[in-house]
UniProtKB/Swiss-Prot annotation:
Protein's pathway: Cofactor biosynthesis; adenosylcobalamin biosynthesis
GO MF assignments: ABC-type vitamin B12 transporter activity; catalytic activity
Gene designation: cobQ
Catalytic residue positions: 333, 431
Main function: Catalyzes amidations at positions B, D, E, and G on adenosylcobyrinic A,C-diamide. NH(2) groups are provided by glutamine, and one molecule of ATP is hydrogenolyzed for each amidation.
Family affiliation: Belongs to the CobB/CobQ family. CobQ subfamily.
Gene3D superfamilies: 3.40.50.880, P-loop containing nucleotide triphosphate hydrolases (3.40.50.300)
Stored InterPro entries: Class_I_gatase-like (IPR029062), CobQ/CobB/MinD/ParA_Nub-bd_dom (IPR002586), CobQ_GATase1 (IPR033949), CobQ_N (IPR047045), CobQ_synth (IPR004459), GATase_3 (IPR011698), P-loop_NTPase (IPR027417)
Protein name (Swiss-Prot/TrEMBL): Cobyric acid synthase
PROSITE patterns (UniProt xref): GATASE_COBBQ (PS51274)
GO BP, one annotated term: cobalamin biosynthetic process
Organism: Pseudomonas aeruginosa (strain ATCC 15692 / DSM 22644 / CIP 104116 / JCM 14847 / LMG 12228 / 1C / PRS 101 / PAO1)
Length: 490
């Protein structure tokens, strides 16, 4: 084998086919075998992001995949991140740093520049690791996106790597998805596809076998395995909000999250989804905010626009009513900014330049600035002095007298966020609060839950990554997979 590592790419017939999950599974499976493996996604479009060890920003799916590889997240793992901030545009992040915002047409022309960043990152990873496990984006068969593609076959052709194609049988039409995708590829791209993985199968595999035999005969390519449907697997969603709940018994704390048009980092709420004593509700447009113990205003990629949407839906009045009845209110990142008195965007970073009135629940004002704050932090919650870890991803600078009552004191001595005088309203810039067991328990007690069961979310995520690797061992053709990775079979 050459000094450079081997590259294997997972592409999907559709969005949500299981690419992120399969890459996570393969990464941990190889890591357990002692293989130096690293995840890579050339281009990601998502509002869920993570802060890296080198002080940049990547998609959260790649951060989970890094954990599967037993590595710290690094910006080379996701060199191009697109964070939508309007219906037709997105903030472009290259090597972890925001470069500019573009509409779709401008970005299409920019792809040649983006590809240089992609190939530079891949080259560094291939030089440092034995296997680079790559995740594609969406589908390689999107005809309108084929020109200058950097996310799927355009990348695979550029680095000359084999491809596995995964499809979700649970949504139906799996054979049409697989065969149709192949038909829409060029001859050279079709040759790169070395096998199929069918995901989320329920039932008797013997009943599926005739279809698998037909697929192999029709395409001349092997089925590398069929992964079962796993209903209780809980890893961060790349983009869509995961509303599944763990089994709940006994008294539960009611937590409501208003879903704003540009909600970001909604993975903040995954620990609450899984907590056996929390009933978590995401409330969308056209719905009234139900009665709750705690309302959480989430992060936002376009805070002033989302604040306007919140008012249009009448949720501002519902929040004030909630507080009058003794409920608790928490704002995270953009949610903190909404809690203040004014929000200023003089540079037009999130849309038209200007200022907006906040909800006026904390004596704060925020000004958006070009330099984004990206940090992994540790500190203590003002409630119960509970230790916590989290991360900052924001462009706002917040000032005001409410900061004299911080929500968090960080280990570097900085104060973060604020609390109201009556203690019913709290805001923080820190994402990931609920992942820290002690901080999560303290927040739930603050919101009214008397006897809190401690849940170790980090341990749950690690357990599920291990389960995924077990599924690879049991259900996939590991010999063929090792060959594709250039690894010995023994």
């Amino acid at each position: 084998m050459s000094d450079r590592g081997r590259t294997l790419m997972v592409q999907g017939t559709t969005s949500d086919a299981g690419k992120s999950t399969l890459v996570t599974a393969l990464c941990r499976w190889l890591a357990r075998r002692g293989v130096a493996v690293v995840p890579f996604k050339p281009q990601n479009m998502a509002l869920n992001s993570a802060v890296t060890a080198d002080g940049g920003e990547i998609g959260r799916a790649q951060a989970v995949q890094a954990q599967a590889c037993r590595l710290a997240p690094h910006t080379d793992m996701n060199p191009v991140l697109l964070k939508p901030n309007t219906d037709i545009g997105a903030q472009v992040i290259i090597h972890g740093r925001a470069v500019t915002s573009m509409d779709a047409a401008a970005y299409h022309d920019y792809k040649r520049v983006a590809m240089e960043a992609v190939l530079a990152s891949h080259g560094r990873l291939a030089a440092a690791y034995r296997v680079v496990m790559v995740e594609g984006a969406g589908s390689p068969a999107e005809i309108n996106l084929r020109a200058n593609d950097i996310a799927n076959m355009g990348f695979a052709e550029a680095v000359d790597c084999p491809v596995i194609l995964v499809a979700d049988i649970d949504r139906g039409g799996v054979f049409a998805h697989l065969v149709g995708t192949l038909e829409l590829l060029s001859d050279s791209e079709r040759e790169r596809v070395k096998g199929f993985v069918i995901n989320r199968f329920r039932g008797d595999i013997a009943l599926l076998q005739p279809g698998l035999d037909w697929l192999e005969a029709r395409t001349g390519k092997p089925v590398l395995g069929v992964l079962p449907y796993v209903s209780d697997l809980h890893l961060e969603a790349e983009d869509a909000i995961d509303t599944r709940q763990a089994a709940k018994v006994g008294p539960r704390l009611k937590v409501v999250v208003p879903v704003l048009p540009r909600i970001s980092n909604h993975t903040d709420f995954d620990p609450l989804r899984l907590h056996p004593q929390v009933e978590l509700s995401f409330v969308g447009p056209g719905q009234a905010l139900p009665s709750a113990d705690l309302i959480v205003l989430p992060g936002s990629k376009s805070v002033r626009a989302d604040l306007a949407a919140l008012r249009e839906r009448g949720w501002d009045e519902a929040i004030l009513r909630h507080l009058r009845y003794g409920g608790r209110l928490l704002g995270i990142c953009g949610g903190l900014q909404m809690l203040g008195e004014r929000l200023h965007d003089p540079l037009g970073l999130e849309g038209a330049a200007g200022s907006s009135a906040g909800l006026g629940l904390l004596a704060l004002e925020t000004t958006l600035e070009a330099d984004k704050q990206l940090r992994n932090v540790q500190g203590r919650l003002s409630l119960e002095d509970a230790p916590l870890s989290g991360y900052e991803i924001h462009a706002g600078v917040t000032r005001g007298e409410a900061l004299a009552r911080p929500a968090v004191v960080l280990d570097d001595g900085r104060a973060d966020g604020a609390r109201s005088v009556d203690g019913n309203v709290m805001g923080t810039y820190l994402h990931g609060l609920f992942e820290s067991t002690a901080a999560c328990s303290a927040l739930l007690r603050w919101a009214g839950l008397r006897e809190v069961q401690a849940v170790d979310y980090q341990a749950l995520r690690e357990r599920d990554i291990e389960r995924l690797a077990d599924l690879v061992e049991r259900h996939l053709d590991t010999g063929r997979l090792l060959a594709l990775c250039g690894e010995p079979h023994a």
